[in-house]
Curated annotation (Swiss-Prot):
One of its GO terms (molecular function) is structural constituent of ribosome. Residues 16-29 have a biased composition (Basic residues). Residues 1-29 are annotated as: Disordered. SUPFAM superfamilies: Ribosomal protein S18. This is Small ribosomal subunit protein bS18. NCBIfam families: S18. Part of the 30S ribosomal subunit. Forms a tight heterodimer with protein bS6. Belongs to the bacterial ribosomal protein bS18 family. Residues 1-12 have a biased composition (Low complexity).
Amino acid sequence: MSEQNSRPQNSERPQRSRRPQGGPRRRRKVDFIAANHIEYIDYKNTELLERFISERGKILPRRVTGTSAKNQRKVTTAIKRARIMALLPFVTED
């Protein structure tokens, strides 16, 4: 039965590297809000909120901005409030 199994054992398999050899290492993203010691994210501060919005008007995800989960929730609610108050657009046209 074991003779029919042609799959190699773990010790026989070549090791795969997760990062391509010779490629640059990615720099860890820094939480902009925590780095600048911003305690309250105000919906009226559109200059700050525009950093977290794409050119199409969508909210950028955490993996792009590098914010923590807690600060991402605060940013999201502030952006949504600013949109309702017409301080930020829901979508932008090209």
